[in-house]
Amino acid sequence: MVKIGVIGLQGDVSEHIEATKRALERLGIEGSVIWVKRPEQLNQIDGVIIPGGESTTISRLMQRTGLFDPLKKMIEDGLPAMGTCAGLIMLAKEVIGATPEQKFLEVLDVKVNRNAYGRQVDSFEAPVKLAFDDKPFIGVFIRAPRIVELLSDKVKPLAWLEDRVVGVEQGNVIGLEFHPELTDDTRIHEYFLKKIV
């Protein structure tokens, strides 16, 4: 039985839990999804999702709760991880616009610009092209970060908005600018689950 953890410190945690449950069901995989708040819960999981929210807050709370160091090591050791929006920022190697107290997991060789699309009012939805499926995916961008550079050839584009990369994959790690959990389309969560089973 597969167990997926969603880092539940701040952000759209319940939406990711529901989307992952639906994806498990659609794939016919027996599994469960847990809300991770403490480091000892990390030992129970086969994959982790870092949701959107506010990256400064998520970074601070991950350090305060003791999740940061063990999670970083587990991802470096091969734990499948997916980060959306602020979760992408947390996974990134380099972050433009970071505050001095922010710490990042640095497990994804990308440079991201923290609030590249501007304020909440500039949020938008647009069709995104996926590397693994011909049908477009509706990308929900909410004060999204922007992937400005791929820092190694280990990083593979996974999603495009027109000709710009908005989602990437590097081994066991997926990072997305947008929020797949805010749609009824579970294809990205299913793709992530297939990395685990």
From Swiss-Prot:
Q: Which GO terms describe its biological process?
A: glutamine catabolic process; pyridoxal phosphate biosynthetic process; pyridoxine metabolic process
Q: Where is the active site?
A: 85 (nucleophile), 179 (charge relay system), 181 (charge relay system)
**What is the recorded name of this protein?**
Pyridoxal 5'-phosphate synthase subunit PdxT
According to UniProt, this protein's pathway is:
Cofactor biosynthesis; pyridoxal 5'-phosphate biosynthesis
Q: Which NCBIfam families does the entry mention?
A: PLP_synth_Pdx2
Catalyses which reaction(s): aldehydo-D-ribose 5-phosphate + D-glyceraldehyde 3-phosphate + L-glutamine = pyridoxal 5'-phosphate + L-glutamate + phosphate + 3 H2O + H(+); L-glutamine + H2O = L-glutamate + NH4(+)
Q: Which organism is it from?
A: Pyrococcus furiosus (strain ATCC 43587 / DSM 3638 / JCM 8422 / Vc1)
State how it assembles: In the presence of PdxS, forms a dodecamer of heterodimers. Only shows activity in the heterodimer.
This protein's encoding gene: pdxT
